UniProtKB/Swiss-Prot annotation:
One of its GO terms (biological process) is translation. HAMAP family: Ribosomal_bL20. Binds directly to 23S ribosomal RNA and is necessary for the in vitro assembly process of the 50S ribosomal subunit. It is not involved in the protein synthesizing functions of that subunit. The lineage of its organism: Bacteria, Pseudomonadati, Pseudomonadota, Gammaproteobacteria, Aeromonadales. This is Large ribosomal subunit protein bL20. Transmembrane segments: none annotated. One of its GO terms (molecular function) is rRNA binding. PROSITE patterns: RIBOSOMAL_L20 (PS00937). Belongs to the bacterial ribosomal protein bL20 family. InterPro entries: Ribosomal_bL20, RIBOSOMAL_L20_CS, Ribosomal_protein_bL20_C. One of its GO terms (cellular component) is ribosome. Keywords: Ribonucleoprotein, Ribosomal protein, RNA-binding, rRNA-binding.
Amino acid sequence: MPRVKRGVTARARHKKVMKAAKGYYGARSRVYRVAVQAVTKAGQYAYRDRRQKKRQFRQLWIARINAAARQNGLSYSRLINGLKKASIEIDRKILSDIAVHDKLAFTALVEKAKAALV
């Protein structure tokens, strides 16, 4: 079996890691051994946070809807229940966007929800 010289593959692997670690602080962007750890950890955080991002945005939408609903004299849960009873199918993302950018339309939705609750 012939000898395998690994210079080319090792250099390529090092370059890939160092490119990914570009912009990191101190040794994390300069020392391969430390950069490998930093890049691996960054990947773990990215994987975790891609899932958390979905939860956090939903929380934000609900907080915005709740605030706008309370300004119109209704709690979030009663608003959602009223919209369901009025068979208005609108998701929380769009509902929060309406609450922030179009107060009149949101007020109209709240009134329909209130009417459906009675």
